[in-house]
Amino acid sequence: MTRSIWKGPFIDGYLLKKVDKVREGGRNEVIKMWSRRSTILPQFVGFTFGVYNGQKHVPVSVNEDMVGHKFGEFAPTRTYYGHGADKKAKRK
């Protein structure tokens, strides 16, 4: 189920403050964040965010196509190593 339109997109408050601070300073740095649940807004386009995936901050460069999605969609949390190989075939 999607979020109600009348509520608007969810953004953590500290994230907006961090973006404003970087915009004022004019620096082009990675903005570290832990809020995977926040929605990407049009004002975030052009910035690079370090989205935490449980181990490290994955750099995510925001472009126009990402607006409306959540930050967590672009930083996978699980690593797939493939299914177990056949041990008999491996031994030969």
From Swiss-Prot:
The keyword Lipoprotein does not apply. One of its GO terms (molecular function) is structural constituent of ribosome. One of its GO terms (cellular component) is cytoplasm. It comes from the Bacteria. It holds the Pfam family Ribosomal_S19. Keywords: Ribonucleoprotein, Ribosomal protein, RNA-binding, rRNA-binding. One of its GO terms (biological process) is ribosomal small subunit assembly. Disulfide bonds: none annotated. Belongs to the universal ribosomal protein uS19 family. Protein S19 forms a complex with S13 that binds strongly to the 16S ribosomal RNA. This is Small ribosomal subunit protein uS19. It comes from Mesorhizobium japonicum (strain LMG 29417 / CECT 9101 / MAFF 303099).
